[in-house]
């Protein structure tokens, strides 16, 4: 876009924080609340699924999902998410943010319910049906990443834009916590109604038939808050930046935002016509794109990829780490529902003490410290805490030192969320031109999910004991060495962050070089 900025976009940039900003945070944030609930609640119920469908009463230990089944159940939604991020990111730039936004929510709600209703006459049938619906659930979740980030970015003023996008993403923390709370409540209720002995006391009686309802209720419950926001999601007008810069209808954008901001915004016919005919048209991966944004795309994809290797390998399999350090007793000493209860309690404590505070520290400090320095700090601190876990690992696993391990582990999550887990979501929504913003955010997010898949699938095998792996698994490098690998991954993330531009306090059109602004242009690059 040549020349200065449109009146409607300038008005949005300068707007005071008001009610519609908070409505946008809630509407977009509840999608992320559901995303996190749906993605992470599966880690709560995999042990229960193993007991229900793969228990052999003649063995001394409860049933567990075979390695290939466990990998499929935990990872298939991530595969769907990757595909959804690419597809809906592209579609959001082609059809508009709003028109695609409602469809992703419907897909999430339907597939979440269907996951809980998975059927089959055998264990294989149930798991296959579950994986099918969780893939498409992930596909819908994937669409929420680029669309929610882009919508919030394009609605916000430039002074608090980072905090608003971070607040949307921070709803993930509440989604993870809510999943743990639901699992705690459901398992506690069923334990009270259907008491059972431990597996070691009575193999068959330790698993009550009603346990099959428990995992289904947990998987389906996340649809409730998402469904409640559908009406408001559909009432949101299309973003002014899409309407003005992509649909080339600046007058309509001004009219839409006049209603939202409760102020009269005038857009001259001459200025609107200039935008309609004068916008740049170079496409994704063109020479002009690579010259302006090639390093930016390398930065946002690589840092998100590296972050998610570490983040998802910890988060999806933290229950196994808790078992090693003694927070969750051996499975045979518990019945099925008690094991679920203890896993959920551990996840709730980590979410409450490490995950959620980190997200909201980002909200509080991102407009003070900036995106670049928060991301550098987060990766560096994650590296340090991972090394602090790995180097004296045997010390942490000896009796009397388990609490120290949990504290260190919690700080790792804190600095992931007060760090790259938040900023890798925020930056791609700010630094690309409007016509490619959703697409590039989707590409960056998909790179992250590729890292998550490596973390989720790879950690199952890599963290196995070098001498006594779990049944069905080959020997791995052990948790200690896996923690060293994750520390190295985080250090690489620190290095790649040097390519990330700073976008604090700047108009989206200045950051993406769609308008010239000599005063702000230098700020697009970290000092």
UniProtKB/Swiss-Prot annotation:
Which subcellular locations apply to this protein? Membrane
What are the annotated GO cellular component locations?
membrane
Q: What else is known?
A: Plants overexpressing PHT1-1 accumulates almost twice the amount of phosphate in the shoots compared to the wild-type plants. Although related to the sugar transporter family, it does not transport sugars.
UniProt xrefs under InterPro entries: MFS_dom (IPR020846), MFS_sugar_transport-like (IPR005828), MFS_trans_sf (IPR036259), Phos_permease (IPR004738)
Q: Which gene encodes it?
A: PHT1-1
Residue spans, topological domain Cytoplasmic: 1-21, 92-99, 146-163, 233-292, 370-371, 427-442, 503-527
Concerning PROSITE patterns, the annotation shows: MFS (PS50850)
Role: High-affinity transporter for external inorganic phosphate. Required for phosphate acquisition in plant.
Q: Which GO terms describe its molecular function?
A: phosphate transmembrane transporter activity; symporter activity
Fetch the Pfam families from UniProt. Sugar_tr
Q: What is this protein called?
A: Inorganic phosphate transporter 1-1
Extracellular side, ranges: 43-70, 121-124, 185-211, 314-348, 393-405, 464-481
On tissue specificity, the annotation reads: Expressed in roots, stems and leaves.
Keyword Transport attached: yes
Q: Report whether Lipid biosynthesis shows up as a keyword of the record.
A: no
């Amino acid at each position: 876009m040549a020349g200065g900025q449109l009146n409607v976009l300038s008005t949005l940039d300068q707007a005071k924080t008001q009610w519609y900003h908070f409505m946008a945070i809630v509407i977009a944030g509840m999608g992320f609340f559901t995303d996190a609930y749906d993605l992470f609640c599966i880690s709560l119920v995999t042990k229960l699924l193993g007991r229900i469908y793969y228990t052999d009463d003649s063995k001394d230990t409860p049933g567990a999902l075979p390695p290939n089944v466990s990998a499929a159940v935990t990872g298939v939604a991530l595969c769907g998410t990757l595909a959804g991020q690419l597809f809906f990111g592209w579609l959001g730039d082609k059809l508009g943010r709003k028109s695609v936004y409602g469809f992703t929510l419907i897909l999430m709600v339907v597939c979440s319910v269907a996951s809980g209703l998975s059927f089959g006459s055998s264990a294989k049938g149930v798991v296959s049906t579950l994986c099918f619906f969780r893939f498409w659930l992930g596909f819908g979740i994937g669409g929420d990443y680029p669309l929610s980030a882009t919508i919030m970015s394009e609605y916000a003023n430039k002074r608090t834009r980072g905090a608003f996008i971070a607040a949307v993403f921070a709803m993930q923390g509440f989604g993870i916590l809510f999943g743990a709370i639901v699992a705690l409540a459901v398992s506690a209720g069923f334990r009270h109604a259907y008491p059972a002995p431990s597996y070691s006391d009575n193999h068959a009686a330790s698993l009550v038939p009603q346990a099959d309802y428990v995992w289904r209720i947990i998987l389906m419950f996340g649809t409730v808050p998402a469904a409640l926001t559908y009406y408001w999601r559909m009432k949101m007008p299309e973003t002014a930046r899409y309407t003005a810069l992509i649909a080339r209808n600046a007058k309509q954008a001004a009219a839409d935002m006049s209603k939202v901001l409760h102020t009269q915004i005038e857009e001259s016919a001459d200025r609107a016509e200039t935008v309609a005919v004068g916008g740049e048209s170079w496409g994704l991966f063109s020479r002009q794109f690579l010259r302006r944004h090639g390093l930016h795309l390398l930065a946002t994809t690589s840092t998100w990829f590296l972050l998610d290797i570490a983040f998802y390998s910890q988060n999806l399999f933290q229950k196994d780490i808790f078992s090693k350090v003694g927070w969750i007793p051996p499975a045979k000493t518990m019945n099925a529902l008690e094991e679920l209860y203890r896993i959920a309690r551990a996840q709730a404590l980590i979410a409450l003490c490490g995950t959620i505070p980190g997200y909201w520290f980002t909200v509080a400090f991102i407009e003070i410290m900036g995106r670049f320095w928060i991301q550098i700090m987060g990766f560096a601190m994650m590296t340090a805490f991972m090394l602090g876990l790995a180097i004296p690992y045997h010390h942490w696993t000896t009796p009397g030192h388990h609490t120290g391990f949990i504290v260190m582990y919690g700080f790792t999550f804190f600095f992931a969320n007060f760090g790259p887990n938040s900023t890798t979501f925020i930056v791609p929504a700010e630094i690309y031109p409007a016509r490619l913003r959703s697409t590039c955010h989707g590409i960056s997010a998909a790179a992250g999910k590729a890292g998550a898949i490596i973390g989720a699938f790879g950690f199952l095998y890599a963290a196995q004991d070098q001498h006594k792996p779990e049944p069905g698994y080959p020997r791995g490098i052990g948790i200690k060495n896996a923690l060293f690998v994750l520390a190295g991954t985080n250090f690489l993330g620190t290095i790649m962050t040097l390519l990330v531009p700073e976008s604090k306090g700047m108009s989206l059109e200045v950051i993406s070089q769609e308008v010239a602004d000599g005063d702000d242009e230098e700020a697009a690059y970290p000092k």
